[in-house]
């Protein structure tokens, strides 16, 4: 069973789960957080279990404003705040007696797959990273998945919300996804997103809320990993993409991978799958989890084996 933990990030209490292998350590640790509107119970325990089997501890946390963590407005995604939460989670991990602070890895999926790249590029404490089906350029992502007409509607909603926030201070909300995405303004206009997250909420992540602030989408359109990739000079980097992923756009992901200069990098394509299958199909999830576990074992465990 994981251990409940908490630490402070920018004045708010962030809560998480610590998973650890048998024994006293010190162990390498993988710092983990989720994608869009994730909570720590959603999918991530399966990945954490794989990393523990590989000999690593794992720290999974809820971002500020989500799940069990403090912070307002609720369900508001600021990627730079989330990246700061990652770095504060690393600082917390360094204080743990069971952790070897010289063997810290980061892992992310979907939106946080991009965060893992940026954290790895900007925090020298990160010695290894895994980026799974990442968001790499938010504006391009939103324009492509919504199409020209849909993106006009989304842009109008963002501008109207900004004016309302200026006048009243109140944040507006839209669904993360919806079966009625053709007529309703949503963030991710895919029916399989609605179905998969409803099932995950019912079976393993009751804290998940399937909505986000409209300002979160504006933040997404100003988010890109590309300026940071050139700074990943020597950090072992694994990127896992889903063949044909049209949600976070596998062609853009591969373009980002090709711009990472380190020679210690690997691209793994999960064949015959989709973005959401890596959430909902345990056999496909296991493929991605085991690839990440092998990567962390290769770079954080085996070189230090006595």
Predicted regions and their residues:
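Conserved alpha/beta-hydrolase
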Residues: 50-70
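Catalytic nucleophile-loop/oxyanion-hole region of alpha/beta-hydrolase
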Residues: 40-43, 66-105, 282-287
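Short beta-strand/loop motif that positions the catalytic acidic residue
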Residues: 232, 239-241
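Alpha/beta-hydrolase-fold enzymes
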Residues: 117-197
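Catalytic active-site module of serine/aspartate enzymes centered on a nucleophile-bearing elbow/loop
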Residues: 271-273, 277-306
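N-terminal cap/lid segment of alpha/beta-hydrolase-fold proteins
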Residues: 1-25, 279
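Short beta-strand element of the alpha/beta-hydrolase
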Residues: 26-35
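Conserved alpha/beta-hydrolase "acid-adjacent" motif
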Residues: 246-252
């Amino acid at each position: 069973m994981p251990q409940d933990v908490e630490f402070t990030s920018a004045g708010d209490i962030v809560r998480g789960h610590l998973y650890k292998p048998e024994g006293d350590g010190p162990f390498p640790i993988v710092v983990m957080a989720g994608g869009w509107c994730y909570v720590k119970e959603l999918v991530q325990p399966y990945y954490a279990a794989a990393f523990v089997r590989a000999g690593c501890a794992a720290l999974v946390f809820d971002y500020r404003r989500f799940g069990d963590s403090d912070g307002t407005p609720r369900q508001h995604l600021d990627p730079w705040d989330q990246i700061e939460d990652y770095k504060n989670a690393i600082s917390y991990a360094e204080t743990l007696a069971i952790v070897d602070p010289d063997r810290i890895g980061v892992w992310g999926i979907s939106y946080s797959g991009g965060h893992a790249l940026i954290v790895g590029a900007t925090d020298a404490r990160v010695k290894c990273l895994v980026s799974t089906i990442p968001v790499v350029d938010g504006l391009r992502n939103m324009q492509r998945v919504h199409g020209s007409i849909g993106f006009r509607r989304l842009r109008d909603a963002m501008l109207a919300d900004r004016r309302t926030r200026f006048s009243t201070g109140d944040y507006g909300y839209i669904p993360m996804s919806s079966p009625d995405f053709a007529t309703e303004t949503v963030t991710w206009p895919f029916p399989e997103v609605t179905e998969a997250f409803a099932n995950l909420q019912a079976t393993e992540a009751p804290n998940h809320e399937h909505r986000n602030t409209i300002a979160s989408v504006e933040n997404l359109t100003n988010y890109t990993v590309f300026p940071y990739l050139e700074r990943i000079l020597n950090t072992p980097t694994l990127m896992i993409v889903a063949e044909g992923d049209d949600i976070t756009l596998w062609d853009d992901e591969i373009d980002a991978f090709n711009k990472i200069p380190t020679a210690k990098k690997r691209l793994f394509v999960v064949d015959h799958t989709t973005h959401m299958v890596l959430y909902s199909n345990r056999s496909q999830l296991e493929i991605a989890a085991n690839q990440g576990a092998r990567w962390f074992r290769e770079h954080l465990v085996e070189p230090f084996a006595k």
